[in-house]
UniProtKB/Swiss-Prot annotation:
InterPro entries: aa-tRNA-synth_I_CS, aa-tRNA-synth_Ia, Leu-tRNA-ligase, Leu_tRNA-synth_edit, M/V/L/I-tRNA-synth_anticd-bd, Methionyl/Leucyl_tRNA_Synth, Rossmann-like_a/b/a_fold, tRNAsynth_Ia_anticodon-bd. A motif ('KMSKS' region) lies at residues 619-623. PANTHER family: LEUCINE--TRNA LIGASE, MITOCHONDRIAL, LEUCYL-TRNA SYNTHETASE. ATP binds at residue 622. The keyword Aminoacyl-tRNA synthetase applies. It is found in: Cytoplasm. PROSITE patterns: AA_TRNA_LIGASE_I. This is Leucine--tRNA ligase. One of its GO terms (cellular component) is cytosol. Keywords: Aminoacyl-tRNA synthetase, ATP-binding, Cytoplasm, Ligase, Nucleotide-binding, Protein biosynthesis. The gene is leuS. One of its GO terms (biological process) is leucyl-tRNA aminoacylation. The lineage of its organism: Bacteria, Pseudomonadati, Pseudomonadota, Gammaproteobacteria, Enterobacterales.
Amino acid sequence: MQEQYRPEEIESKVQLHWDEKRTFEVTEDESKEKYYCLSMLPYPSGRLHMGHVRNYTIGDVIARYQRMLGKNVLQPIGWDAFGLPAEGAAVKNNTAPAPWTYDNIAYMKNQLKMLGFGYDWSRELATCTPEYYRWEQKFFTELYKKDLVYKKTSAVNWCPNDQTVLANEQVIDGCCWRCDTKVERKEIPQWFIKITAYADELLNDLDKLDHWPDTVKTMQRNWIGRSEGVEITFNVNDYDNTLTVYTTRPDTFMGCTYLAVAAGHPLAQKAAENNPELAAFIDECRNTKVAEAEMATMEKKGVDTGFKAVHPLTGEEIPVWAANFVLMEYGTGAVMAVPGHDQRDYEFASKYGLNIKPVILAADGSEPDLSQQALTEKGVLFNSGEFNGLDHEAAFNAIADKLTAMGVGERKVNYRLRDWGVSRQRYWGAPIPMVTLEDGTVMPTPDDQLPVILPEDVVMDGITSPIKADPEWAKTTVNGMPALRETDTFDTFMESSWYYARYTCPEYKEGMLDSKAANYWLPVDIYIGGIEHAIMHLLYFRFFHKLMRDAGMVNSDEPAKQLLCQGMVLADAFYYVGENGERNWVSPVDAIVERDEKGRIVKAKDAAGHELVYTGMSKMSKSKNNGIDPQVMVERYGADTVRLFMMFASPADMTLEWQESGVEGANRFLKRVWKLVYEHTAKGDVAALNVDALTEDQKALRRDVHKTIAKVTDDIGRRQTFNTAIAAIMELMNKLAKAPTDGEQDRALMQEALLAVVRMLNPFTPHICFTLWQELKGEGDIDNAPWPVADEKAMVEDSTLVVVQVNGKVRAKITVPVDATEEQVRERAGQEHLVAKYLDGVTVRKVIYVPGKLLNLVVG
């Protein structure tokens, strides 16, 4: 064994061994308990970033630990390979998205191997290959036949720069999240999957997910947004149709003083024919922010349509306004307004001088003061005719019942959740497998024409999708008739909604899933990824699992038992102000810093002499140029050091502050472990440990070893507090470094301790542990070694620390046998110099003894 720890030499050797032995390849084995550990698959952007490294290190630690418990562990990896960035990069680099993507995959695969992650590479998949997306296309056609897919014209957020539809969440401050271009409203035909048909199940089954973070479950509950209310129909004077609204507060219905409709509503369109002001307003709304978060904060605007609706209970005429806060695609495109008891309605009514009628009393029973704001709390009705005096629940039911009896109301359950629009007007995605015949009939692509292959050898102009620009690509024949293929491609959330299941049978040729393999491995035991995926990916992931279950492919109701959302990785951020006032962000690697005595940054400059402004720690990002390249760190310190720092610096679900000083500390620790093993093995063979022949000091050290095993086992397995597990191993290492090594049993005990330390560190730092296990002559490869088991007998304390007080003041701390009697403890306490001093010449009036903990002598 060489004296110095040289990660650059050992890591590549160990990685080669894993590759050659196919150490982490697994097959179904009914005789073993399975464990499926999965991290969210990466987008092949070109290089790994520290966020990836953190996510995948957490997954690898858990997978390796579970393997050491003797389980059949599946830990696969693949590539979420379709998506818009590839198109931008292709245009920029004058290539096509496919070669750019495949080059990135090859590069990033090497980076993952360099970090020592124990993946089953035989299951690797890339979602951009026809072998993968053919089954997604086939599944879509099956969903169409089940009436779970439909096409409709829909108002969308359109980015004129990217020429694509954006989801509401992708609109930030009215602009495209990717390129910051102002978003427009546009009506286009799109394909939808009926996720709303599963709304109740998606909501109710959240209660089964005991090991998912409450924050994620709450976000999904709110996103699905189940509400109980009443749908009410209004007659409108001089208008051919009625207006239907939905309300969750029928108790306030007597205070409804106006209706509001979306700018795209047929009533508003009709009114605009003779109203230029309204026509201009409708035009303005076409280019308005539509993400819900924006709706809450934007200025509320409207125009009177001139139409009057009739209140079904009072018979009063109330105005109908077109308003920018009503969306056609939410509910009926019309809402009833109760300005006395809804703040948005109140602000709108105040702005345009509309009637505000209070119908709910304040909590103290007085009429509410509406001079400044609406009263939004529930309460007792007044000003409401026959319903006066009813509380919220009674009024809800009475008004709902009356409207139902009149034939103008119906109790309804509503959802905020909308059907999933899966059409994208981009090229680099899976083609949607639908065709249109010459007679206008729309139908699924026949099975014998699947997959509909996306051509990869294309020229990108950065504007139009190559399959839209090439009329020949769309031409096909179905049943002998000419037909045109759909030229939209799937939303890339489609591919990431079922990849976890395909990992169980990536080579399967007979269908989407091999049920036998899928049901052996599924559900996933732990799924690891960022909380930013809470409402999109993680909802579609659950939805797809239920679709596959209902197609008979899987037996379970949910795709993953546990979800672990890792925290972000933060780093220092610096900038200097350029000549034109712009901020130029400087990498923390290039910042020369001065620190105060507490280690805080007080001054910074770069190599060119610019005075830098330090903005603190923020999420590693390209925009702030504060990302740290994992590859540079691995080359400098080794993969094991980077992995150890990642797991030690912070709890897995909290933010992690990148500090190179912390990385250096992790590296020093591994050097100490190496040195201790080197010094131990240099002394030659070791005798067998004789537990019965140990001295008190040796027993105490062995007790520490086994207590550490127990703590680390609990921290990794049950608590998943990996940082405290590492801290416990470090504490034990400090004790081992000071332990005597001269006697035969000293060395035998050290051998037992080091074999335990190396196994406990193995999930975190597998390369050094693989090597040290061999040097310690551990049995076989450490990858097949069992996790150490704490010896209960070794952990039994045979002595305990008792605090000795005289008149309540601590005078000594003494070690006594655990079974010592009170008399023996008093006798031992009397031998202490300070205790004897305070007892000299006085009478002990009272003795308070808490066995094994405290002796208090009261003297007078």
